[in-house]
Amino acid sequence: LESDDNLVTLGHNRLAIIDLDPRSNQPFAYNENIHIVFNGEIYNYLDLKKSLGSKGYSFNTTSDTEVMCAAYMEYGEKCVDYFNGMFAFVIYDKKKQLLFGARDRMGKKPFYYYINGRDFEFASQISAIQLFNKNLTISQKSINNYLSWGTIPDPDTIFNEVKKLKAGYSFVYDLNSGSYNQKPYWDLDYKGTNLYKG
């Protein structure tokens, strides 16, 4: 998908799990203003579909992808509060001229991104970002972390210029201003929990 103003280009290679019909292929257009690319599965999409249907939303597919778009239309950025599953997604809201995305609560699905001026790139694999950016530099901090702990903690990656969206975070990228803002929509709640009993 390429927007009329050439500001947004979305691509997707789909592994069909729920709705195998080509009508559910991605990038998926919910209407003329809402488009989505989505990696994962929403486990409670049938319950959401029923709830949204009672609010007047209609559906042309049996996919969880379409339900996510309707949830965004109804709840805006709060839609992630209703999703139970593993996911990384980006919604292009043409009317508001923004990209809205999120990563699931436990970070099961990966989400890498690169920002350079007004250039915002994202992918589920870091190699996809590498294809278009040949001057990425290796992060010594990330090498040290990997050699010490066997992992590179979010939001860092092996490259200085590429970051991971943290688990349980959502973001908004404003296409007009080029501003990128992320925030947690979920975190573990330890309040009132006795973690140590001695």
What are these regions (language model features)?
Residues 1-198:
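Cysteine-centered catalytic environments shared across enzyme families
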